[in-house]
């Protein structure tokens, strides 16, 4: 970080010559000097060059107005104002969180000024670095010799082997040197929450508006289990979102709890909806408790917020209404909601404490902020027994954490602190909304078909758009007002084939075909439904990437309308079965898969499959214990009616459990089986379109088997 910007506007010798001297002095201190043309050019530079560490400008020309503009972007950036003897400096800077230094235009002062700038730059770096990351950088720079783990010793061991050297060269020396042992006492301990690790947790809690925050190094799958193990002791009953992540199913397999499921909605597109407000009411819960064997009043609730497709809840209503001791919002996909006013009241850490309740929010820092994979956080608001909670934390946390993951978690929080973080999120929101509008424009201008966007008719305001009962765009039935909101950065594109009410069209392009084309061109889709594709506009998505996606979508339309051969348009798919796809054209492939979906009446089938849950014969914990005792057998998928499932069955998409361990598909819930059979049939007819179904195993004959409990194990 060594770039200094000088606004080159002087025009007179007594100003130009001192600046030229300063330029030379700064270069001797290894600064890189750049000269923006004007104010707008400077602001663009600050926006696009994060390594800028200072701005030098003429106070007579720019003064306070420029400072205010810079403050909105980075309130910590050092500013250096040059003034002459007659300049007016009677301004109050008390309200600005700025580092402003004033210098006079004078010859012979360049060395002193350059040293002052170097000192201020060091202070700036020290200010923006969070505590653990700062301590880790310091430790690596000191280059101490250690006789403890890890065995590669800062990368030395790798360089003793040819293949190890290749590995070392790829990842670089700092990655190796920062991979250190928990024996390094000056960095404290992740497990004991001491030293710089404790300071990092306190720092993160302040940034995310939490009472207490924890860094988790094995993803939100682990964070969810930590919260659940503490909040729901064995023998208790919990309320849990049926559209929960599979990690929460694993929690129920590990802990002997009785689940009562919240039942979310879904629309014809297969987009996951929210849990209706009625599900949170005391009377509804009391009825479910009465209907569920061995259930007692729930002590804990788990809600997925946002949904996979970007729907956020009115969390204030849930916190106030839900009568449980603790509420866990699994917010893996929205770690950014604390940094824009459009998310106020729509996330777990919004607002203050809730009397008599503990609110948890787990977030996948790595998913949509800037952190290494597996980086996750737990935020807590309310009173917990920290010693007991830490037992659950240590149960799921390695004693050899990777400090790179831990430091990246803290750095992600530091990036979101203050105006700089707000600017990052606002930039994502603006890019996503602009992309949405471009799709709508191209749809209007295109001949024949084009992609559509799942969103309200008017998106002129920057907000989370509400789903209203008097609107039809969302396709949900009996929606509650002021309950669910669409996050603008989660962009769902619609392909032809299905209307919002579930009516099937004669012409259709299944989204899986578009996803395969995009993958051929280096663009990975987050989630693919029957006729929809989800794209996430995270802070890492820039204008270039958004334009590349637009270009790829228009290229797909052009190639599809030309009816190119599959082997030319989708070469990877062609290689799955060259004989099958040899002479097939893209329109034939699309129409045949579309007809298969129409044949099964997918919208109606999905409604029925998710309307009636399989019967819970035993808890997931009890079913897993029987599996551990070897009391399972495999049967064909077609034979699972009336059998108790041993594992969760989770088709992707949508990526949420369809059948839980210990549940039985009955005649009443047969649509669940029919839905699974339809997914398998598409893959059987068209090589390369097999659905990934966790818990179902494809055999050599192409049929699927599932694991069920042996008949005698029901007792």
From Swiss-Prot:
One of its GO terms (biological process) is lysine catabolic process. Its cofactor is pyridoxal 5'-phosphate. Disulfide bonds: none annotated. It holds the Pfam family OKR_DC_1_C. Gene3D superfamilies: 3.40.50.2300, Aspartate Aminotransferase, domain 1 (3.90.1150.10), Orn/Lys/Arg decarboxylase, C-terminal domain (3.90.100.10), Type I PLP-dependent aspartate aminotransferase-like (Major domain) (3.40.640.10). Induction: Part of the cadB-cadA operon, which is under the control of the Pcad promoter. Expression is regulated by CadC. Induction occurs under conditions of low pH with excess lysine and anaerobiosis. The global regulator Lrp also has a positive effect on the expression of the cadBA operon when cells are exposed to moderate acidic stress in the presence of lysine. Repressed by H-NS under non-inducing conditions. GO terms for molecular function: guanosine tetraphosphate binding; identical protein binding; lysine decarboxylase activity. It is found in: Cytoplasm. PROSITE patterns: OKR_DC_1 (PS00703). Inhibited by ppGpp, also known as the alarmone. It comes from the Bacteria. Keywords: Cytoplasm, Decarboxylase, Lyase, Pyridoxal phosphate. It catalyses: L-lysine + H(+) = cadaverine + CO2. Belongs to the Orn/Lys/Arg decarboxylase class-I family. This is Inducible lysine decarboxylase. It comes from Escherichia coli (strain K12). The lineage of its organism: Bacteria, Pseudomonadati, Pseudomonadota, Gammaproteobacteria, Enterobacterales.
């Amino acid at each position: 970080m060594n770039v200094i910007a000088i606004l080159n506007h002087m025009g007179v010798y007594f100003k130009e010559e001192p600046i030229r001297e300063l330029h030379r002095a700064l270069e001797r201190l290894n600064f890189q000097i750049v000269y923006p043309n004007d104010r707008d050019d400077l602001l663009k530079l600050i926006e696009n060059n994060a390594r800028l560490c200072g701005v030098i400008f003429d106070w007579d020309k720019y003064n306070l107005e420029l400072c205010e503009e810079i403050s909105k972007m980075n309130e910590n950036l050092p500013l250096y104002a040059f003034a002459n003897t007659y300049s007016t400096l009677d301004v109050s800077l008390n309200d600005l969180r700025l580092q402003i230094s004033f210098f006079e235009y004078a010859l012979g002062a360049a060395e002193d000024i350059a040293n002052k700038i170097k000192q201020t730059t060091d202070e700036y770096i020290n200010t923006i670095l969070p505590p653990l990351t700062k301590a880790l950088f310091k430790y690596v720079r000191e280059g101490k010799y250690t006789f403890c783990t890890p065995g590669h010793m800062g990368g030395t061991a790798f360089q003793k082997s040819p293949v190890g050297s290749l590995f070392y060269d790829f990842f670089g020396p700092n990655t190796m040197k920062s991979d250190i042992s928990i024996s390094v006492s000056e960095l404290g301990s992740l497990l004991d929450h001491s030293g710089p690790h404790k300071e990092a947790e306190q720092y993160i809690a302040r940034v995310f508006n939490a009472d207490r925050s924890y860094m988790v190094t094995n993803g939100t799958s682990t964070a969810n289990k930590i919260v659940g193990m503490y909040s729901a002791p064995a023998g208790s009953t919990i309320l849990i979102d049926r559209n929960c992540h599979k990690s929460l199913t694993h929690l129920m397999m590990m802990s002997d709890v009785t689940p009562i499921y919240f039942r979310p909605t879904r629309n014809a597109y297969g987009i996951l909806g929210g849990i209706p407000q009625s599900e949170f009411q005391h009377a509804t819960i009391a009825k479910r408790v009465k209907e569920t064997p061995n259930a007692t009043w729930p002590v804990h609730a788990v809600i997925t917020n946002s949904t996979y497709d970007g729907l956020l809840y009115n969390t204030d209503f849930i916190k106030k209404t839900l009568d449980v001791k603790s509420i866990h919002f699994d917010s893996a996909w929205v770690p950014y909601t604390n940094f824009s006013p459009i998310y106020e009241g729509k996330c777990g850490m919004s607002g203050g404490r809730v009397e008599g309740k503990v609110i948890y929010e787990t977030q996948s820092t790595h998913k949509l902020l800037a952190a290494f994979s597996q980086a996750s956080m737990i935020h807590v608001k309310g009173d917990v027994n920290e010693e007991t909670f830490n037992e659950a934390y240590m149960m799921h946390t390695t004693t050899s954490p990777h400090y790179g993951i831990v430091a990246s978690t803290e750095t992600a929080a530091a990036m979101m602190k203050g105006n700089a973080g707000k600017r990052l999120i606002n930039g994502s929101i603006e890019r996503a909304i602009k992309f949405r509008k471009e799709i709508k424009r191209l749809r209007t201008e295109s001949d024949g078909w084009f992609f559509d966007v799942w969103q309200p008719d008017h998106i002129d305001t920057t907000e989370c758009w509400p789903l209203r009962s008097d609107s039809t765009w969302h396709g949900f039935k009996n929606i509650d007002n002021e309950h669910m909101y669409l996050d603008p950065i989660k962009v769902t594109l619609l392909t032809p084939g299905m209307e919002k009410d579930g009516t099937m069209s004669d012409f259709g392009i299944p989204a899986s075909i578009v996803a395969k084309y995009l993958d051929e061109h280096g663009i990975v889709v987050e989630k693919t439904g029957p006729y929809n594709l989800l794209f996430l506009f995270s802070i890492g998505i820039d204008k270039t990437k958004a334009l590349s996606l637009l270009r790829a979508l228009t290229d797909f339309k052009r190639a599809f309308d030309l009816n190119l051969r599959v082997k030319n348009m989708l070469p990877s798919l062609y290689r799955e079965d060259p004989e099958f796809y040899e002479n097939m054209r893209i329109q034939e492939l699309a129409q045949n898969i579309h007809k298969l979906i129409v044949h099964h009446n997918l919208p109606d089938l999905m409604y029925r499959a998710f309307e009636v849950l399989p019967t819970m014969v035993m808890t997931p914990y009890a079913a897993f214990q029987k599996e551990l005792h070897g009391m399972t057998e495999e049967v064909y998928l077609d034979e699972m009616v009336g059998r108790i499932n041993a594992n969760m069955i989770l088709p992707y998409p949508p990526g949420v459990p369809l059948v839980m361990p210990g549940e039985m598909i009955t005649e009443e819930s047969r649509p669940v089986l029919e839905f699974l059979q339809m997914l398998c049939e598409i893959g059987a007819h068209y090589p390369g379109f097999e659905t990934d179904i966790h818990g179902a195993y494809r055999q050599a004959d192409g049929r699927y088997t599932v694991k069920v409990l042996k008949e005698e194990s029901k007792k």
